A protein has these predicted regions:
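Conserved Nudix-box catalytic region and its N-terminal flanking loop in Nudix hydrolases
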Residues: 49-53, 57-62, 66-106, 147-148, ...
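Conserved hydrophobic/aromatic beta-strand scaffold that supports enzyme active sites
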Residues: 38-40, 59, 69, 138-140, ...
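A short coil-to-beta-strand element that immediately follows conserved catalytic motifs
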Residues: 115-122
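Nudix hydrolase/Nudix homology domain
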Residues: 7-13, 18-22, 80, 121, ...
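Acidic, metal-coordinating catalytic segment for phosphate/diphosphate chemistry
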Residues: 22-64, 72
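Active-site-adjacent beta-strand/loop module that shapes the phosphate/pyrophosphate-binding cleft
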Residues: 39-40, 128-147
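Acidic pyrophosphate-coordinating catalytic loop
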Residues: 29-34, 49, 75, 125-136
Length: 202
């Protein structure tokens, strides 16, 4: 027996009309590594970090009005990169209960040697929504004080760069011309630096 109710046809601009038909398919696990897992939902394959906390990028400007960047070699792309201080939230057993704000303070000091007086959440979004479930939070660090050398943990070899805020964009393009890989999120980070805080809101 057919229903007498008419079929519901959603307009093309309705959000639900653009959701793929297999978006609610069961999730299959294709591979589990130490840090990453490969999943499949319907026809879609994507990576998922094994730590559930996501990642955090720290927007840090020194009292001398210099933006903190970090340089390190990334094996996945076989290049030296320029990034902002960043790290995973709750990636180690002893940090399992931390949130993005705690992770931001820890990673800032670990990578750059600076400790901050306070932290401000700015924004959160996907790092690469077409291939990963990872979400990244941007956190602004305030009232920085130098307390150590930085350089990262024993598995990292990080070089810290302190760049005058007004020259940061130009400096990044110069590093790109030298062959460094520049994380595009840095330019979003510089925009957030200019548009967050009391000075930006005044």
């Amino acid at each position: 027996m057919q229903s007498s109710e008419p079929a519901v046809i959603l307009p093309m601009n309705h959000p639900d009309s653009r959701i793929p038909s297999d978006a609610s398919a069961p999730v299959e696990t294709l591979h589990v590594g130490k840090w990453l897992s490969l999943r499949k939902r319907g026809r879609w394959e994507y990576a998922e970090r094994n730590n559930p906390g996501g990642a955090v990028i720290i927007l840090a400007v020194t009292p001398e009005d210099k933006v903190l960047f970090v340089e390190q070699y990334r094996v996945s792309i076989l290049k030296h990169t320029i990034e902002m201080p960043a790290g995973l939230v709750g990636d180690l057993h002893e940090h399992g209960d931390e949130d993005a704000m705690l992770a931001a303070g820890r990673e800032l000091e670990e990578e750059t040697g600076y400790r901050c007086g306070r932290l401000e959440f700015v924004h959160e979004g996907p790092s690469s929504s077409g291939m990963s479930t990872e979400m990244i939070a941007f956190v602004r660090a305030w009232d920085l004080v130098k307390v150590g050398p930085g350089g990262g943990d024993e598995s990292e070899n990080i070089i810290v760069h302190e760049v005058p805020r007004t020259q940061a964009g130009e400096w990044l393009f110069a590093r790109a011309a030298e062959g460094y890989s520049i994380d595009p999120k840095l330019f979003a980070g510089l925009w957030f630096i200019e548009h967050t805080g009391e000075k930006a809101r005044s």
